[in-house]
Design a protein with these regions (language model features):
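Glycine-rich, acidic/polar active-site loops that bind/position phosphate-bearing ligands
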Residues: 1-314
């Protein structure tokens, strides 16, 4: 619905569900056919964990081409949805009781034809460049969050309580850490496949489906390359379920939280030389003004939660 009323999921299917009554099967088929006719390759697709939630993974490309493909992808999804009588949304968390939608991004850094993230014999086959790149992402994660997670609703996905409950299937990172195959970490180092040196990579899991890919990828590259240029040391990895740890345990491991809301994220962004230098004065100032206005509008909104909880008893 476009009037702000509560939406209804297009189906009640679950993770990897392939039952015939799953509307997503035909939706994905039609969408992928259209994407590939436009030269945008798709590697995988399946139903995700939440009702009505679909995952379509685009094949890798350089950063700018990937951002272009994402913008085209979003338009295609919305067009196909309209043709099928449903609405596609990239809102990070449209349902409080279901997991949100991320834009998990796999990336590698190349010097010519050589994958600069790969080093034979090192831990996880991850090079010093790769380790410093991750360190840069972690060190600057909080201050770039207003760009990588730019909506009020983005922080409902990051901090949504239902995503921590058993079986909810939510995998949005709330804390700044990295790990090997750890889906609770902000940065994950996938398992290396022998002989696939070109595919050595990292996965950034904080981005959500509503992010501006041009700005978000610019900030990921700036933060990572800052780590490489200045030789940041990578802290120890987290292999435990970070969500299950206590605050004291996380503090002992040096693991800090991401911003709790857009207001916190904007405060950190406003103080950030890295974000200002990367975006440039015009974009930096415009982005801040626009997002501060959105945050102030949200803060003054009387929500359905307040009416439900307070109106009958106060």
């Amino acid at each position: 619905p476009l009037d702000g009323s509560r939406p209804t999921p297009a189906d009640n299917s679950g993770y990897f569900d392939h039952t015939p009554q799953n509307i997503g099967m035909d939706f994905r088929r039609q969408a992928i056919t259209m994407l590939e006719s436009m030269g945008i390759s798709v590697e995988f697709s399946h139903h995700e964990g939440a009702p009505g939630q679909q995952e379509i993974d685009l094949r890798y490309a350089d950063a700018l081409s990937t951002a272009d493909n994402i913008m085209t992808f979003r338009l295609v999804m919305k067009q196909v949805a309209l043709e099928q009588g449903v609405q596609a949304t990239f809102m990070p968390k449209p349902f409080s009781e279901h997991p949100g939608s991320g834009m998990h991004t796999h990336l590698s850094l190349f010097e010519g034809d050589r994958n600069a993230f790969y080093e034979s014999g090192s831990e996880y086959q991850l090079s010093k460049v790769g380790r410093s790149f991750i360190a840069g992402l972690l060190k600057h994660a909080a201050e770039i969050s207003a760009v990588t997670n730019q909506w009020v609703n983005s922080y409902k996905r990051i901090w949504g309580g239902s995503e921590r409950t058993a079986g909810a299937g939510g995998e949005a990172p709330s804390y700044i850490c990295w790990g090997h195959n750890n889906r609770s970490a902000l940065v994950r180092v996938p398992m290396y496949k022998p002989g696939k040196t070109g595919s050595a990579r990292i996965e950034v899991r904080s981005l959500d489906s509503g992010a501006n890919p041009y700005l978000a990828y610019a900030m990921l590259l700036a933060a990572g390359l800052k780590g490489v240029e200045e030789g940041y040391e990578l802290p120890p990895g987290a292999e435990d379920d970070v969500w299950a740890l206590s605050d004291a345990e996380r503090r002992a491991m040096g693991i800090e939280p991401l911003p709790q809301n857009l207001g916190e994220a904007l405060t950190l962004m406003e103080r950030s030389d890295l974000v200002a230098e990367t975006l440039g004065e015009h974009v930096f100032d415009f982005f801040l003004r626009n997002k501060k206005s959105e945050w102030e509008e949200y803060r003054s909104e009387v929500t359905a939660f307040e009416l439900r909880k307070n109106l009958p008893v106060l």
